[in-house]
Amino acid sequence: DLSMNGYSTIGHHFGFSTLGDNPVYERMYDAALLSTGSTMFAAKLIAENQMDRVFNISGGLHHAAPDHASGFCIFNDPALAIKFLLNSGKRVAYIDIDAHHGDGVQNAFYDNDQVLTISLHESGQYLFPGTGFVNESGHPPGIGYAVNIPLFPYTGDDIYVETFKSVVLPLVRTFGPDVLITQLGVDSYHTDPLTHLQLTTRGFLDVIQLFSDMQLPWLALGGGGYDVGAVARCWSLAYGQMIGLTLPNNIPTDLVQFTGTDQDDASVTAGVVKTTNGFLDNGTDPLLTGELETTGSTSGYSFALPGAEALFQAALIPQFTHNPSLLEGY
């Protein structure tokens, strides 16, 4: 019962509160388990060489700790996926571009030299969770395998992408991972209401292309993002870029309204907002060009977006909830 004074003793102990950043909602456990199970299914596809690239947009919940929820995150699916891949004999590079520091994943592998964690984020001086400073670099034998790149508020595309090229790329090349896991939070976008970084679609996609150019088995996860339109656009474009599809500037009119949601009867409007970056942020970003290809992937990669049906068919949710070795410490 979490209703009394905003939280109960038990709920507060595990990080839940009706007043905080981990509110309890109906079927919360089921939803969190489905998201985490999808990531585990994606990791299984990568580990077994069934797919080269997998994108679970519902994943990337990087703040959760072994014993409590944190920062809207119930289970830390990136950490669990990394552990699964480690148990499969893989070395993993985890790169987190969410505006918030990926503290939960870093802490999970802080003393492990088989996992390279890199987080580019708004400095903890200004933003939750208040961590992710450059001196957080790991414990033996993992010293140097935790890398943090805290950025000042209002950092834009040019500095962000140049920093990525100068710091992230050499580290990944030197580490030589078997698998790349990325957390693609979109709250670094310039219109996000909770953060202060100033990335545009161009900068975000430049980083996605740099990930793609690494030519590694790639498990991409979602993450934060509180401008819903920006999240939808960036992840759609990332999806296309991962599989070699060029998407058009404009959403086809027959796809604007979504079947099965409360937007069915909403009027279709084009709200135009002039931004400080000098372009119109109305879903028709002039930075993007090209026409939609309908013949499928041209990248040569096998690709999957795991859905609930495939997830349950694989029975990974029961494995995830009842396998003690997989859940140890989480």
Positions of predicted regions on the chain:
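A general "terminal functional-core" signal
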Residues: 5-330
